[in-house]
């Protein structure tokens, strides 16, 4: 029996997320060519062997560690009520913002409440 050990890599998470910039936001969509915010974070993590729940509230509940914004590490999920994104460093994050927009990089993590960690 083949066993594969998955090692968390924030850099791999970020690169997977950045590979989807420009994909349209579609409410309820989970990829691979369109996303809503939590569908995006779920898809990115799944591509890296980490299975997290579908909605932003479930993603927060499933986190192994909830961290303050001052403790963020590259690859953490940024969380606020109703929205999630992936921290890419230097105060920036990649996310699927809202209807009419596309997956993109934005600045200003202070809009979020906390970071979520799954390892």
Q: Which residues does each PLM region occupy?
A:
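Aromatic- and glycine-rich peptidoglycan recognition patches
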Residues: 3, 8-10, 15, 50-69, ...
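Secreted/periplasmic proteins that engage bacterial cell-wall peptidoglycan
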Residues: 12-54
């Amino acid at each position: 029996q083949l066993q594969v050990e998955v090692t968390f890599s924030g850099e791999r998470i970020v690169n997977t997320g950045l590979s989807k910039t420009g994909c349209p936001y579609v409410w309820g969509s989970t990829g691979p060519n369109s996303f809503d915010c939590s569908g995006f974070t779920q898809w990115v993590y799944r591509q890296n062997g980490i299975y997290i729940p579908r909605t932003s509230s479930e993603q927060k509940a499933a986190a192994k560690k909830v961290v303050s914004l001052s403790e963020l590490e590259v690859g953490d999920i940024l969380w606020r009520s109703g929205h999630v994104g992936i921290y890419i460093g230097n105060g920036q994050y990649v996310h699927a913002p809202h209807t009419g927009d596309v997956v993109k990089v934005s600045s200003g993590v202070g809009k979020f409440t906390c970071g979520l960690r799954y390892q």
